[in-house]
Amino acid sequence: MRTIRATIALLALGFAASLAAAVHLVPVVGGLASPVFAGNAGDGSGRLFIVEQGGVIRVLQSGAATVSVFLDIRSKVIAGGERGLLGLAFHPQYASNGRFFVYYTRSGDGTIIVAEYGTLSDRNIASAIETTLLAIPHPINANHNGGMLAFGRDGYLYIGVGDGGSANDPPDNAQNLESLLGKILRIDVDRTASGLRYALPPDNPFVNTPGRDEIYAYGLRNPWRFTFDRVTDVLWVADVGQNAREEVNMPVVRGGNYGWRAYEGSSCTGNDPPLCNPANYRFPVLEYAHDEGRCSITGGSVYRGNRQSLPGGTYVFADFCSGEIFAWDGTAQTVLLDTPGNISSFGEDEHGEIYVVDLGGTVSRLAAATSCTYAIAPARETFAIAGGAGSIAVTAGDSCAWTAATGDAWITLGGAAEGTGNGTVTYAIAPYTGKPKVRTGTIVVAGNTFTITQNRLRLLVRGGG
């Protein structure tokens, strides 16, 4: 039975209207080099780890404004386009064992590597010792590398691998059960099997049957980002489309076939018309067309945070090309925010708050819009004939933006005349030789009016209130 499908249309529903007005982005850190992922270690430290495509993982301490290097493997990585250091996952017992895992494309031949690392006694610095778990050949095309790693509640490591690239998956890797390309894989990193540095979960769907034992689900084009709902443990996979459709698959289940390359979203592609039998596939719960500048989905997190920034269970995702951030509650969806960036990923902190990663170099937190109040001091000033300069102190909440403006040509505002949170507006007053003897002007700061009086007397009187 087909699951419910939805298209990204702006719906005039209470859900859409309320969410669009309810959230904003709070800058966390900038100056990064092509960040593609952010996440937490689950160790209670409050740290945020940020993956840069070129081969560096940086760590942001709780409450800090700058990052430090956690791991640098640039010498191992080929980066650019869809290649690079692409994924990071911490072992569920990282707090005690210091183990974590990375996904990258290897310099020289483009092979996809899933590798294990550890940390030094200083948990802010990783060991340089690498243990390669998987090496998946990807020699021909530079695109569709996948790149996501995440642990499920079952303790197994899930791995998202692209179909090998080029248009329309020419070798049909996504449907080939003897290939690891175009799949979600699942492995046990706490045990080993003969000839492997990992073990196979005994309930993987193709254990002891034709097909690679590592495969968990298949029929995917480029599952760049996926997430587990931290409450239900349901697996959501956002699959990047070809030329027409972007899709979200949920639940992604053991042995599920999600249709590529026979289907793109719920539409038969024409690549294999005889195979377009809906009974053989699981279809997306959500899909959208390539219009209005949209072209590539970036999944996605299910909001379960403590700050109540969004209703619990809301799925948040984006389009890399349009910069839009979307929200979906299972029945209705909306454009949550329209950003100017290229959103490469979402991440979560230990408390379930969602972070937005922009390939341009920033990480921001999705937060409930603040009810902002503003105050200024003083409220007025008086100047004599010679004019002069002054300043206005602005008091505002940390994430509350404000601007200052004047319509009087003899008042000149200094600096940017805008800010966020507490700040200062500076201004200059021109000499006055005209008529009448007194003139009055105003500066409006965040809705508050600051009044300036100037007269032709040479006595300067200044006061506030």
Give residue spans per PLM region:
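Surface-exposed binding patches on compact interaction domains or structured appendages
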Residues: A375-I376, D398-T426
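Bacterial N-terminal signal peptides
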Residues: T7-S18
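A short beta-strand micro-motif common to beta-rich folds, especially ectodomain repeats
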Residues: K437-G447
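Beta-propeller domain segments
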Residues: V51, R83-L85, Q93-A95, D163-A332, ...
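Enriched but not universal
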Residues: R2, T7, L457-G465
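Solvent-exposed, low-complexity, repeat-rich "mucin-like" stalks and linkers
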Residues: A377-T403, N455-L457
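Conserved blade-ending motifs and adjacent loop-strand segments that build the rim/top face
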Residues: A332-E350
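Acidic, Gly/Ser/Thr-rich repeat motifs that build Ca2+-stabilized beta-propeller blades
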Residues: A20-N168, R225-F228, D233-G241, G293-G330, ...
